[in-house]
Regions:
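Flexible inter-domain linker/hinge segments
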Residues: 1-8
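Local sequence-structure signature of Cys/Sec-based thiol-disulfide redox active-site neighborhoods
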Residues: 11-15
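Short Cys/His-rich zinc-binding micro-motifs
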Residues: 18, 59-61, 90, 148-155
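Iron-sulfur cluster-binding cysteine motifs and their immediate structural context
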Residues: 22-41, 63-89, 95-113, 125-139, ...
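Short, conserved phosphate-binding/catalytic loop or strand-edge motifs used
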Residues: 43-46
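Extended hydrophobic/aromatic segments used for targeting, binding, or gating
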Residues: 48-56, 62
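Intrinsically disordered, low-complexity segments enriched in small/polar residues
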Residues: 118-123
Length: 184
């Protein structure tokens, strides 16, 4: 079952409602520096009553190999159970991505050292500095690990909120799929 039933929370797309507009993926990228952390591919459950897809996104596992394997303390579990990458200490070494059995961690280029949002540009403001960690030798780390953070610092999950048909939602698999025997 590719770990679907063991995860704390699963992103689910009702394929009977999905119109393949990519709003979910675009909305994710809009709040994650242009990087969508959602891939609309994954296992499907197709029965007479449901046509459900499980897009690739972080499982926020009970026993996360990425978290326990990180040598730089760049990952933590939040008080509400989500796995979070700490950008300030992430070296971009790729170990967490290699350890993730579900391939849900992406290695992305770090932002430049300044970041100007569109409102800043519109108002003619100076870009705000972005912290870029460096190695003990002064080398700047060029990559950053990213995974679905459930938009915990936002009032809603952007992918879910921006779906025009309500096709995408999060569930606790052990409750939602009681009695389901196989997911292909």
């Amino acid at each position: 079952n590719q770990g679907l039933m063991e995860q704390n929370t699963a992103l689910v797309i009702d394929m009977d409602k999905c119109i393949h507009c990519d709003n979910c993926s675009d909305a994710c990228a809009a709040v994650h520096d242009g990087h969508s952390l959602l891939t609309r591919h994954g296992p499907q459950l197709d029965t007479t009553t449901a046509n459900i897809q499980f897009p690739t996104s972080c499982h926020h596992c009970d026993d996360p190999l990425c978290l326990t394997g990180c040598n730089f303390n760049a990952m933590e579990r939040t008080p509400t159970g989500e796995i979070r990458i700490i950008e300030e200490t992430c070296t971009g070494c790729n170990l967490c991505a290699k350890l993730c059995p579900y391939d849900t961690i992406a290695m992305v280029p770090r932002q430049s050292e300044t970041k100007a949002g569109w409102i800043d540009r519109l108002l003619g403001r100076e870009p705000e500095p972005v912290f870029v960690p460096t190695s003990p030798t002064g080398k700047k780390y060029k990559r950053l690990a990213m995974q679905c953070d459930l938009c915990v610092e936002r009032p809603h999950m952007n992918c879910v909120y921006n779906c025009p048909t309500g096709a995408i939602f999060r569930v606790k698999p052990s409750d939602y799929f009681v009695g389901v025997e196989s997911i292909s």
